[in-house]
């Protein structure tokens, strides 16, 4: 976000007051993003760039003054730009907010953060008692919201990240068996299977409702001959040398710290020699500079908003150590925005 700063020297008292309000503004912009998505504002402006507030209100059936205030506020935070008397999406936000078929569509993400923000009502009590409320106890509606918000993550991986990981890409092209740990609603399972027709995919998750969502998605996509989803934890696999690739998307940081060594060991056992383990996750910043800089500081924020779930976001160094302790060797690495991507190989 933007904030006024003193031209030279340390920030003034007024600067810091403005900074506080700028931080609070993020709460309200999160709600604006979701309200605009629900109303269809972003998609309407992708269809008709240059539409003025009154015309947009007519198309959406909304109040013209309310619609104009929404657009002006979105403009003030860089989401919209002027086009003559009307509005258009700012650079790249047409893909990010206005095109559900885009690989980079993230318009559902604000909704998830609004839902998980409800946990904050209990934070003071958790702080005082040292208690947790695990992710899996948040109910079916929350699981649906998460599945919807994360369904583009595998597309981002396949379209933008995988080309930077030639070893893993070659293995997937060859085909074989793939295990997705923490499959959630099944989007990684089906999208990887659709992209690589010689690959069969198995998804596992400890949350039963998410597994049912994944099973339904597999059936809807006509992939039941190559894809499965099971309610199972990774340490219940009981399979040795069974998979060419194991994937995990935003899952490793959600495994309880006491269970992580066993989970990594189970993955190592399940991989065939020469197989790959993909960790697409957050990595907690290891320096003050990265702790204070976007996008890396978002991992610290993830540790904060998932704090009472019992999650611990590992640093990159800690992830490497976990791989080594399980007998895996880091083979490839890259990053995308807030995400750290590691590929470890089984010798």
Regions found by a protein language model. Give the residues of each.
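A short glycine-rich, Lys/Arg-flanked "PGG" loop and its adjoining helix->strand segment in the class I
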Residues: 261-273
């Amino acid at each position: 976000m933007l904030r006024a700063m003193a031209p030279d020297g340390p920030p003034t008292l007024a600067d810091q007051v403005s900074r506080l309000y700028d931080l609070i503004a993020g709460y309200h912009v999160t709600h604006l993003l979701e309200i605009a998505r629900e109303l269809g504002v972003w998609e309407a402006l992708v269809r008709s760039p240059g539409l003025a507030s009154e015309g947009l209100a007519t198309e959406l059936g909304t109040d013209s003054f309310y619609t104009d205030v929404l657009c002006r506020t979105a403009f003030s935070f860089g989401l919209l730009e002027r086009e003559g008397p009307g509005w258009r999406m700012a650079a790249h936000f047409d893909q990010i907010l206005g095109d559900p078929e885009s690989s980079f569509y993230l318009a559902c993400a604000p909704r998830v953060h609004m839902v998980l923000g409800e946990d904050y009502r209990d934070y003071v009590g958790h702080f005082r008692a040292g208690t947790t409320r695990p992710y899996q106890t948040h109910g079916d509606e929350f699981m649906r919201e998460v599945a919807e918000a994360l369904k583009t993550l595998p597309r981002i991986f396949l379209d933008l990240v995988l080309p930077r990981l030639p070893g893993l890409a070659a293995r997937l092209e060859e085909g074989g068996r793939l295990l997705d740990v923490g499959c959630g609603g099944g989007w990684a399972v089906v999208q990887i299977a659709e992209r690589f027709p010689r690959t069969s995919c198995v998804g596992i998750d400890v949350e039963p409702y998410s597994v049912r969502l994944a099973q339904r998605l597999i059936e809807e996509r006509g992939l039941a001959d190559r894809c499965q989803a099971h309610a199972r934890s990774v340490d219940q696999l009981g399979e040795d040398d069974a998979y060419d690739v194991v994937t995990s998307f935003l899952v490793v940081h959600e495994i309880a710290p006491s269970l992580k060594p066993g989970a990594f060991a189970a993955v190592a056992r399940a991989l065939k020699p020469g197989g790959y383990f993909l960790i697409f996750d957050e990595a907690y910043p290891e320096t003050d500079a990265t702790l204070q800089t976007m996008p890396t500081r978002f991992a610290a924020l993830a540790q904060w908003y998932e704090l009472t779930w019992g999650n611990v976001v590992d640093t990159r160094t800690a992830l490497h150590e976990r791989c080594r302790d399980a007998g895996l060797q880091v083979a490839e690495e890259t990053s995308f925005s807030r995400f750290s991507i590691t590929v470890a190989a089984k010798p």
